[in-house]
Amino acid sequence: MRKGLPLLLTLLMTSTAPGLRAESFGHADVDGLTRTVSEIRGQLRDPASRKDDVRALLSGRLAEVRQDGAETPLALDRLATAGKLHTVPIDFMLAQLRLQTARHFNVEIEKALANRAAPALFIRGGSMTLDQLLAEAANSHPGALEQKGEKVVSHWPIVIWSDSALVIAPGQSLELSTEDGAFILNSGLLTVDGGELSASDGTNPGLNAFRPFVATAMTGAVQARRAHFKSLGFGGSGATSGLSVLGAALFPSKIASYLTDSSFENMSGISLENTHRVVVSDNHFSGGTGPAIALKGVTGAQIRDNVITGTTEAQAIDVQNTSSSIDVTGNILIGNRGSGIFVANDARDIAITDNLLSGNGRGGVSVVRSACVTITDNIVLSNSQVGIKLRASHALTLSRNDLVANAGAGVSIVDQDENARVVVDGNVFTGNKSGIHGGAASEVALTANDFSGQSPILLDGEFAPYVPHLLRAAAGSNADSRALTIHANTSSADPVDCKTGS
């Protein structure tokens, strides 16, 4: 039975139970969807493109991806007072970086500083625009900044103190010198409103791997809209990742960080850690090592309507380390080296909804050692490895997803605890290596799934003996008889309660 199914039995796998998507996939449908996704990918090659540029192609099976999320907060916070420019010794700057980023501090950063005798620029007492910063630096600190065409190049590190702000306005461009080891430490407010923030070309002689970065820490916040970030960051996630927001329990930021309608080109990535109320929406991430967006210990973030393509080393979206109440909605994640979305290490209350995940190197979605994750209304198409992989996780619901032509199983469920439970409801399986793979799994409840396009292997691994049960359930006369529970829990332990958090 595992090797193949007669056509009649396969047709039995089309369920008409409520909640199922209205139409099954045929070969022509798969070919059409594949062509459309290829066209979407082609139109998104320009880093300046956005999801809106392909909205006309998001129809039919892709209509759920088309939907807009909640309104983006567009109001930028402003400081009423004018800031002043000072300098601080570089050792103070490094001590602050070490203090404010704690374990995220990279001790090798000191090697990147071309002139250890030079101080760092220090903004405090209010707000400064980039033009004001350039003018004051030219008067009192020659050589710290210079105008090169339309760009302002910083050769010194810049500190934005907790009572201050730096504003990069529309049409303005700040370039941090790679050769000089420049970077920004922000514990105040960094605003990039229609401007550009980038790293210069070249190699740092003291630390070849170094690329300039922006670290926002403790009470700091960063707000960007219609901005362009380019070539920032090195060393994966953390303070040097490119653009980071690193919160602290004793020093919570009173201003929310958000990044919207912006381009991130060849960035190592965005790293959000131990912070809350963050919105990352309507952006385009192209190239870079990845993760494009990494969350660790984050509460209450919205990651929505972003385009992420071509990460070279890691996943597109990475949610880890007790992150909770995270909404990942309406994103287009295509051609990334790792998984499209990776959730791990005690993440909880994660909603993954209305996303398009295609051509990703380590599968569409992976959930590892996490709980209370819902994966709903996603298109998971032609990914290497598995469409959706669940490992050692609790209280998971997969509903109304299209799992199509993935190199591995449409869904893989492995290494579950004895009291874990997975609900697989109303999904469509088409042309995957197998429908659902099981290994050391606990309870899996199957209802109203469509396997009519999934052949020859419906259930794989330790689930293979359940194929006859699945066929009988599919032929049932009512919704209750069409349900199938594999490995029903017999443990006396209470299941995870997603409402109470226990």
What are these regions (language model features)?
Residues 324-435:
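Eukaryotic tandem repeat interaction scaffolds
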Residues 8-15:
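Bacterial N-terminal signal peptides
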